[in-house]
Design a protein with these regions (language model features):
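Charged helix-capping and loop-helix junction motifs
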Residues: 129-134
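Glycine-rich nucleotide phosphate-binding loop and flanking beta-alpha elements
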Residues: 53, 120-122
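Short loop segments at secondary-structure junctions
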Residues: 86-88, 118, 141-143
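Short amphipathic alpha-helical segments
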Residues: 58-61, 125-128, 139
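Surface-exposed, charge/polar-rich loops and edge strands
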Residues: 1-5, 12, 104-113, 122-125, ...
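Redox-cofactor binding/interface segments in oxidoreductases and associated redox assembly factors
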Residues: 47, 115-116
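N-terminal active-site beta-alpha-beta segment that forms phosphate/nucleotide-binding
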Residues: 1-100, 104-108
Length: 146
């Protein structure tokens, strides 16, 4: 099975789950993240603003935006441009119907990068949505925990 077929299969499987099930699974996953040593020790964390079929990060972002330096991606052309989330940050709908922070680009370091994915294997390898945004971004930050 190639990546395109796997994405199609997973999309079909996701449709079998309710919104409530997704929220329950999201809370479980994000609770594990909150307690993970890499997150606990991190000062600067890149997260993502979730799409409806992804682990729901919206409440998580609100909970942590004033406790850690939270960075969110914005998409400009073919690239991810990281932006720091602050108390005053406004959001706008981006190219893919994703809420994106409206702020200056962040050019600092990261302690942890959390990325969305269509699927992950036991070794942490991921399949994204096929556009390569995170692949290109992560290649520039190989030293950062993910």
């Amino acid at each position: 099975m190639d990546k395109k077929e796997l994405r199609t299969l997973i999309k079909t499987l996701k449709k079998q789950h309710s919104k409530e099930s997704l929220l329950e699974q999201s809370q479980l996953i994000l609770s594990k993240l909150e307690n993970h040593q890499s997150f606990v020790e991190a000062e600067t964390v890149m997260l993502y603003s979730s799409l409806p079929d992804e682990v729901d990060t919206h409440d998580f972002l609100e909970r942590w935006r004033n406790k850690k330096r939270i960075i969110l991606p914005t998409v400009v052309g073919d690239d991810i441009i990281p932006v720091e989330l602050s108390k005053e940050t406004d959001f706008a709908i981006g190219d893919f119907n994703i809420l994106e922070p409206q702020n200056e680009p962040y050019n600092g370091n990261y302690d942890l990068i959390v990325v969305p994915g269509v699927a992950f294997d036991k070794n942490g390898n991921r399949i994204g949505r096929g556009k390569g945004y995170y692949d290109r971004f992560l290649c520039k930050h190989l030293e950062v925990k993910r």
